[in-house]
Amino acid sequence: MGTILDKIVDQKKKEVAALYETYTPVKEKRKTRSLVKALEQFTVIAEVKRASPSKGDINLHVDVRKQVKAYEECGAGAVSVLTDGQFFKGSFYDLQTAREESSIPLLCKDFIIDKIQIDRAYEAGADIILLIVAALTKEKLKELYSYVLEKGLEAIVEVHDEQELEIAIQFNPHVIGINNRNLKTFEVDLSQTEKLGKRLNEEKLLWISESGVHSKEDMIRVKRAGAKGVLVGEALMTSSSIHTFFEDCKVNI
């Protein structure tokens, strides 16, 4: 029996095959917005997340335009959009809708295994592509990272443990994302940020913390560990007031 990640990657292979049958990448170049610049000060990357394998439906019928507008008005430094349909109920249409509404950097949050997915994300308006070390061979990661650069985009290279971190460091990526969620079990442990953050601070690399941040205390914890930003999804998608959440999570350390 495979892990959740195995099942997701198997589904992605089917989606990639379908994309090659139905989608022709556009050749046009466009301007992009920089997450690296946004991370010059500690910032929140606010996520549009309808559902997840671990939580089921979170906010299935969210108004993406309204949500993204609220994120930007409340001071988010970037917006992340889940584009996976099978497991997270997202879509590239959600990404495109977010682009139409937002003037800040936009992350395509998906399980990228092929260049054609990057082409599709680029066309939908992404500025940043998530590359997950756990989902890729080292050779494929190198190929996709190079393609992200070729497209004029930025990458977040995501890691969960020391072994993945050592692979990511070799690429000297724009941003490293420490995912506190184990994608094989979907369990969350915020201490991963503190463990792996020490190594990244030594290397003087730009990094963010992903998953498991629900409160001001969590925000303080990851900032003290050295993170330059934090990706928040579920907590914002279930909040009765996005404005109040941002106010509560303002940290000055």
Curated annotation (Swiss-Prot):
Pathway: Amino-acid biosynthesis; L-tryptophan biosynthesis; L-tryptophan from chorismate: step 4/5. It catalyses: 1-(2-carboxyphenylamino)-1-deoxy-D-ribulose 5-phosphate + H(+) = (1S,2R)-1-C-(indol-3-yl)glycerol 3-phosphate + CO2 + H2O. Pfam families: IGPS. One of its GO terms (biological process) is L-tryptophan biosynthetic process. One of its GO terms (molecular function) is indole-3-glycerol-phosphate synthase activity. Keywords: Amino-acid biosynthesis, Aromatic amino acid biosynthesis, Decarboxylase, Lyase, Tryptophan biosynthesis. InterPro entries: Aldolase_TIM, Indole-3-glycerol_P_synth, Indole-3-glycerol_P_synth_dom, Indole-3-GlycerolPSynthase_CS, RibuloseP-bd_barrel. It is an enzyme of class 4 (lyase). Its EC number is 4.1.1.48. The gene is trpC. This is Indole-3-glycerol phosphate synthase. The keyword Amino-acid biosynthesis applies. Belongs to the TrpC family. Signal peptide: none annotated.
